[in-house]
Design a protein with these regions (language model features):
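Glycine-/proline-rich flexible loop or hinge segments
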Residues: 6-10, 51-58, 79
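Active-site-proximal specificity loops/subdomain of glycosyltransferases
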Residues: 37-74
Length: 219
């Protein structure tokens, strides 16, 4: 509904390695949003009561990869929700993002890209009710280390993902206009996450680094 809070689920690292970008990103979301925002940081946990406890993450490329497929159930299959990775800065009202209509026959929308069968699942908008009775209950698959990639294949092969404007997931500024900036190249992420052990590189676009620095300073 138009007056409901904007529900945003953010996949992040487990032990505070991304604390700086978490703070800057959350600030940017709340600053730009015209409605109340309900933010959930999804991270690995030892809390057995948590919805995010006990997931098999052996084959995940990040500490949170598979969590995105449980978000509609976490919302009780009601309303709409947004998923994003943590390595982002928001630059446009997320109420506009969550209010995008999910096309008939689609479970969600994501931008087109070169990975994952032609979709980039780092920003997703869900119509949670559409997932009920289509995707099995989380408890039946969260211990399966292959589930994350099975879901990607399922959604791509059955054409269940609609198209999201690329400006809502601009990969290091690969769009002329940026609504949601995604620092996708890990070696150049300006907050220097502790978990990254590869060769650090300077970001090629100083103006994009300044966007992060401004959001962090404001937060």
């Amino acid at each position: 509904m138009a007056n409901d809070p904007v529900r945003v689920f953010i996949g992040t690292s487990s032990n505070g390695e991304d604390a700086k970008i978490e703070m800057a990103y959350e600030h940017s979301i709340r600053k730009n949003c015209s409605r109340p925002v309900d933010i959930t940081f999804m991270r690995q946990t030892n809390d057995k009561e948590s919805f995010w406890h006990g997931w098999a993450d052996k084959n995940w490329s990040t500490p949170f990869s598979g969590y995105r497929w449980g978000i509609p159930e976490a919302c009780n299959f009601e309303g709409k929700a947004i998923y994003t990775d943590v390595d982002m800065i928001n630059m446009r009202d997320m109420a506009e993002l969550i209010d995008i209509e999910i096309p008939e026959g689609k479970l969600c929308i994501a931008r087109d890209g070169n990975r994952f069968g032609g979709k980039e699942f780092c920003v997703i908008v869900y119509d949670c009710a559409k997932w009920k009775n289509v995707v099995p209950a989380v408890e039946t698959w969260k211990a399966d280390p292959t589930a994350h990639h099975q879901f990607i294949n399922l959604f791509i092969q059955n054409d269940l993902v609609g198209t999201l404007d690329k400006r809502w997931n601009s990969h290091d500024g690969d769009t002329d206009e940026i609504w949601q900036l995604h620092y996708t190249h890990m070696p150049t992420q300006p907050w220097r996450p502790a978990w990254f052990t590869g060769q650090i590189q300077e970001h090629p676009h100083k103006d994009l680094v300044e966007i992060y620095e401004k959001a962090y300073d404001e937060a």
